[in-house]
Amino acid sequence: MATRTQAREAVIGMLYAYDLGNESIIEIARSMLEEKKIKNKQQDFAFSLLQGVIEHLSQIDLCIAPYLKEWEFSRLGGMERAMLRLGAFEILYTETDTPVIINEAVELGKMYGGEDNAPRFINGVLDALSKAHTKNKKSEDCSKTQDIINDALGKES
């Protein structure tokens, strides 16, 4: 039986493919998960993560952007983008404990991050996002979280 870590690992691979232009990934996701021996509850979990990230992609990117410091989102490695998007989705839209989410993202960063400092970078971005989001836990979108972010950065909404 697959673990949630393996499910997340499969999801970042599919998000990477989606980011490269394979927009039909959602249609073949279940068969890809089957091939990776991710079945039943873990398959449902993985599929819901993939579907959720894709559905909320623009909001997720908007929420991540302020924490990239000098980096532009488009200049990040594809796998780093996928890991940040998955982690941000889970922080913003699920009930999973934040330390679990961040730890999973960091561990995936150690395996798949293109840079040696990818795990540290992922940890910093997701931790900062989670702290801002905690101030507005029930936000359906990132608008209130974005207001908090802008306030912290001294920007106008």
Curated annotation (Swiss-Prot):
GO BP, sorted A to Z: DNA-templated transcription termination; transcription antitermination
Entry keyword annotation includes Transcription: yes
Keywords for this protein: RNA-binding, Transcription, Transcription antitermination, Transcription regulation
Stretches of the chain forming a coiled coil according to its record: none
Gene Ontology, cellular component aspect: cytosol
InterPro entries: NusB-like_sf (IPR035926), NusB_fam (IPR011605), NusB_RsmB_TIM44 (IPR006027)
Domain of life where this protein originates: Bacteria
SUPFAM superfamilies xref list: NusB-like
One Pfam short name: NusB
GO molecular function terms listed in the Swiss-Prot or TrEMBL record: RNA binding
NCBIfam families, per database record: nusB (TIGR01951)
Summary of the function given for this chain in its UniProt record: Involved in transcription antitermination. Required for transcription of ribosomal RNA (rRNA) genes. Binds specifically to the boxA antiterminator sequence of the ribosomal RNA (rrn) operons.
Family the UniProt entry places it in: Belongs to the NusB family.
PANTHER family listed in its UniProt record: ANTITERMINATION NUSB DOMAIN-CONTAINING PROTEIN, N UTILIZATION SUBSTANCE PROTEIN B-RELATED
Protein name as annotated: Transcription antitermination protein NusB
Originating species: Helicobacter hepaticus (strain ATCC 51449 / 3B1)
Gene for this chain: nusB
